[in-house]
Amino acid sequence: MLLGALRMEERKGLMGRERDQFPVGMRVLAVDDDPVCLKVLETLLRRCQYHVTSTNQAITALKLLRENRDMFDLVISDVHMPDMDGFKLLELVGLEMDLPVIMLSVNGETKTVMKGITHGACDYLLKPVRIEELRNIWQHVVRRKFGNRERNNLDFSKECNKPQSADTDHGPYQPTCGSSDQNGRSSRKRKELHGEDDDEGDDNDYQENDEPSAAKKPRVVWSVELHRKFVAAVNQLGIDKAVPKRILELMNVEKLTRENVASHLQKYRLYLKRLGAVASQQASIVAAFGGRDPSFLHIGAFEGLQSYQPFAPSAALPSFNPHGLLTRTSAAAAFGLQELAAPSSTIQTSTGNVTVGHCLEENQQANLAQGLTAAIGQPQLQQNWIHQEGNGLSDVFSGSSLTNTLSSTLQRVPSSSLPPQELLECKQAKVSMPPSIRIPPSSSALLERTLGVSTNLGDSSISQQGALPIDGGFSADRLPLHSSFDGAVATKLDTSLAASQREIGQQGKFSVSMLVSPSDNLALAKNAKTGASSSGSTIILPLDTARHSDYLQFGGASNSLQKMDGQKQDHIQSSNIIWSSMPSTQLPSDTQIHNTQSQRLDSGSFNHNIGAHLADQTNASASILPQMKFDTRISEEKMKQKNTYDLGSSKLQGGFNSSGCNFDGLLNSIIKVEKDDLPFMDNELGCDLFPLGACI
């Protein structure tokens, strides 16, 4: 133990003495091709008490350094040499030995000095060299050793903190540490590797900068065909299970990456989300109309009416009030009727409740309202379709009773239950509705004229109100509706198929009586198939309606006028109405409403009968074939004409509401009145109130 301690003390003493004598004995290698300069340099170094080794060739100096790596502490080399450039020697020494190198040259330009420093020279001396400069070159050796020691200590600390692996030969607490030279060499190797990597990285960056277009990814344009392939792949996988990788495999398109498919899939899902929001909005609209199945929103064009536009899924309902439709709130079957004063020029009317409930479902009404508006293309509906200058005719026809009669009959029918032969015969049929107009015999100047209305089913267009083409309008499954209404009060059935009958009593009250009775007469159906069915009726107008002859261009009808024998004579007329597109489950097989009461005027009674056949079928292109006969008696008291009349909302006594739903405006979108252009039809009908062009 004592001997070991003594040896350690001796070594420390020697090291201390060497440190005290430093830089005496520092080993220096001098390289210069000029022998004179080399001899002067060697002499000056020896005066500084350095150990000097000199050579005039750079290759020889490099060989000495490689053979004896630990024999030299410093290298002094000339810049310009014949066998090897001084900068090249500087690079090799710095990479292999990690020794400090001092450059020596007569060229003191800044560019040359900068080149030497950048290549790793620790100092740059100019010839002729001076001894004062050589005395302080030892600081480069000390600086390099301390720098290497600091790096070694840093590497040692990292290795000590690193956990030992299981396959190492050293113990778990024995870090592997080599000598300072080995650490220096390893650090130099790491520097060399990092330097090479940096050079390669710089070269790559330079190449990338030279070719910027190669770095950018080509943009994919999603054409129609490419999008179809994408949608087909998504549908095959399912929207929930569709992932970009599987979609790309199914599409099998070159130059299409997963990122492109992922981006397009995200946009496609957002598109489907927006479509779902629109569909939910439409479903809420259908629910507001009371419909259960919104499939009618996607049905094609209306069969039989080529100009009819269906309800578009993306269209909104800007002007149609869903609360305006008649909804059934009670089981009462009676009609609410209101009495109207004859002297007043404005006729207050109410709306019947049964016909809309049986004839047209609420969702179909909403579909019809929007579809007809879109078909005509009118941005705004005119509220008074017959309200023109000198609007006296509006008082005669009781406001909008005729217009609402048509508006309630338009239906949307999904499919037909008749055989193709029956449908073909019905399409070729021509149906006419020529009600006749007559002045009561109590007046001196009477006008007897016949009003004719016709529809040509072959043209698949509406040529007159109240007449529509029929496809499969006749069915063996008819539901008779038998109803009778008294004339105690006046009413206007906005959505009914019946024609009103008006009387003015002795007290000046304007009343309407109506009777609906079953009719089993099939002559109408047969005539409709052959195209020769028509019926006539009588409407009594006051004298002042003669000035509206330009509106009512009357002619001879196929049926003769039925004249009244007197005020005491009872006149009963019947009418056949074909009423289709009505499920049998919504109507009882036999509904009877009896409230008959004969009203007498000057010891005379008046009754009005209307027969209606309800055809239970699931599909027909058109829905209504009204064939009506009217017989109305009006006393000599004339109804005063007024330019405006009230078509506001009314509440029915039977518990039915019509809050703001104006079917006059709906009819306005179909028919546009033209005063001066009233075409006639030969022999089949009396006249057409409106030209065919206004209805298309």
Curated annotation (Swiss-Prot):
Residues 214-273 bind DNA. One of its GO terms (molecular function) is DNA-binding transcription factor activity. Residues 154-214 are annotated as: Disordered. SMART domains: REC. Two-component system major event consists of a His-to-Asp phosphorelay between a sensor histidine kinase (HK) and a response regulator (RR). In plants, the His-to-Asp phosphorelay involves an additional intermediate named Histidine-containing phosphotransfer protein (HPt). This multistep phosphorelay consists of a His-Asp-His-Asp sequential transfer of a phosphate group between first a His and an Asp of the HK protein, followed by the transfer to a conserved His of the HPt protein and finally the transfer to an Asp in the receiver domain of the RR protein. Residues 27-142 form the Response regulatory domain. It is found in: Nucleus. The modification 4-aspartylphosphate is found at residue 78. GO terms for biological process: cytokinin-activated signaling pathway; phosphorelay signal transduction system; positive regulation of DNA-templated transcription. Transcriptional activator that binds specific DNA sequence. Functions as a response regulator involved in His-to-Asp phosphorelay signal transduction system. Phosphorylation of the Asp residue in the receiver domain activates the ability of the protein to promote the transcription of target genes. May directly activate some type-A response regulators in response to cytokinins. Belongs to the ARR family. Type-B subfamily. PANTHER family: TWO-COMPONENT RESPONSE REGULATOR, TWO-COMPONENT RESPONSE REGULATOR ORR22. This is Two-component response regulator ORR22. It comes from Oryza sativa subsp. indica. The gene is RR22.
